[in-house]
């Protein structure tokens, strides 16, 4: 399984992904799901991938080949993030059709984020069908893969004016919550922070399984959650609570 998230706030974008690929209890491997395209002088892109490994690898290989060979259409030539998303979606569909593997089981989805000079930074999610959606002011983050466990903390914390450092910490807590509830998601954890208008992808870190900071984060978050839970107001069966009428309770 996979978990990737990209958080787009006013100050920039945070990208976070796990590196565990699971094809059964006895087939667990490590593959990076974060890919950078940073050779353009006026643009920077990061792609996070989830889904069929063969499809994602073929898609990324084709994207890199187009850049390397100065193709007419590539991530170095598109004029907007939306055009970049359309292009990646088209390549993904082409890779599936080339090998006759369209349909469930061979699908892949992508998070594409970055900035082209003269426009604002953006994050988009590209579906297996090739269409895409973008993050919004109401929901400044997008997830792919095993998203449900890490979503609550993002909903509570992330706003457009959230500082990048806070967004990065929130992404790691989101990842920790996912790893705790789903063993098919796991380290190494990759994180990259892009500062708006910097056109630089230098703020990258890879957290290994035995990383001291990850262990401390997990321990602290667990402790603070338990402490907060025990400080909740006690459940009081107040006199004004609606009583269950005898014979009309619906309880059998």
Located regions from the model:
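Solvent-exposed alpha-helices and their adjacent loops that cap or buttress functional pockets
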Residues: 1, 7-8, 27-28, 37-41, ...
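Short, surface-exposed beta-edge/turn micro-motifs
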Residues: 1-4, 11-12, 43-45, 107-110, ...
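Conserved short S/T/G-enriched processing/targeting/catalytic segments and their helical context
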Residues: 4-100, 144-155, 159-162, 216-241, ...
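Short His-Asn-centered micro-motif
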Residues: 49-50, 113-115
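A two-mode feature
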Residues: 91-98, 107-108, 114-115, 120-252
